[in-house]
Amino acid sequence: MTAFDRGIVNHASASYNRADMRSAFRLRKKKPRPRVPEGVRIYAIGDIHGRADLLERMLNRIDADLASNPVRIGIQVFLGDYIDRGPASREVLDRLVANNRSFRSVFLKGNHERYLTDFLTNPPILGVWQHYGGLETLMSYGITPSINANAATQAQLAAALDRALPESHRQFIGNLESSFTCGDFFFAHAGVRPGIPLTKQREEDLLWIREDFLLCEEDFSKIVVHGHTPVPQPDIRPNRINIDTGAFATGQLTCLRLEDDKLDFM
């Protein structure tokens, strides 16, 4: 039994009655197993949130995996939320900007990167951002933040971040993609809006959606690989896979490995 099948079994045990379980397995039997193109291996990495230590460890594991199991085309897909919450947001971006990888890397945008760029042009958003780890990001750039800052202080902090933000970080964040597709898989930070074709999804939904997506059991036409909503362990459903395991708090950064029709975790 593969990881994909185990995920369906585990989800069925937790959430389905017996009739629903039989229905879920009939659905899987009718459809071919999701796969990536021949000769391609994907490493999808969940929300990093300022944990440069975990990122470095994961990149080393990926390098070791490629060295011991070479593949024609390797692709790293980062699902966004590189910053906030953890202590080393600047160091995470430094590492990703350097990107001295010998294979393709795809960097997706998360809602926390949106917070940062919005703060630069709309300082009062700090009142919200500070509750989601924004102060930790400011501190990683050498800025001493003020809790419950007034409008003048918010503007000063935004100006300080604007000065401290390296041009390489600015370009990196500005070039982040909203989604990525490969084979039978669609990658986005938060998920997708049910009922809307994948090619017509709004960036707001790709970055922010939660319940409407998480509670949906319909077929999205591809398996959606996402983060955004922390779970204790990777959550495999028939229509989506969540790999945000709350790295900033748990110390567990998850990488999903896809090759042919096989799925496992690192």
How would you label these PLM feature ranges?
Residues Y82-A98, D118-I125, D235-I236:
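Metal-dependent catalytic neighborhoods of phosphoester/phosphodiester hydrolases
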Residues T121, L135-N242, G246-Q252, L258-M266:
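Acidic, His/Gly-enriched loop-helix segments that form or flank divalent-metal centers
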Residues F4-L93:
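N-terminal active-site segment of His-dependent metallophosphoesterases
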